[in-house]
Amino acid sequence: MSSPSSSLVVLRDLHFGYGERPILEGVTLEIPRGKITALMGASGGGKTTVLRLIGGQYKAQSGSLLFDGQEVSHLSHDQLYAARRRMGMLFQFGALFTDISVFDNVAFPLREHTTLPESMVRDIVLMKLEAVGLRGARDLLPSEIS
């Protein structure tokens, strides 16, 4: 659902932490629609955390996070996947979605950027995983392999 706002991403008073350890406190940010935006700052400043919150990999403890007018934390799995297809994120390190399987991480660009039938996507992904010795890890999350 499109918002009339010129901002595609809106964070309002966002808070996130691990247990009693705060990582982000009261972050407010708007990312304009149709613009390339960079998050820059010191190591440990929360840049990757902000991106993972926007991508729905983490859930904020409080505050509001809208993507195209929709609260990210209220999106279903399918809606979140559809929203991610519209996002372009490049992390300095790592390029995997932490909350989907190894198989789905490899399949993601094929599903997004081609019109291949799912049976062919499956075959290609399994061949790629076999080539790097990860076929047996296809159902694991990235954090479950080293």
Task: Describe the residue ranges of each PLM region.
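The feature captures the beta-strand-to-loop junction immediately N-terminal to the Walker
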Residues: M40-A42
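Helix-to-loop junction immediately C-terminal to a conserved catalytic motif
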Residues: G55
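Conserved ABC transporter NBD signature motif
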Residues: G63-E71
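Conserved ABC ATPase "signature" region
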Residues: Q70-E71, E118-A137
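ABC ATPase NBD coupling module
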Residues: V72-G88, E112, E118-S119
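Short coil-to-helix segment of the ABC ATPase nucleotide-binding domain corresponding to the Q-loop/switch region
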Residues: D99-F108
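Conserved ABC ATPase signature
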Residues: L140-S146
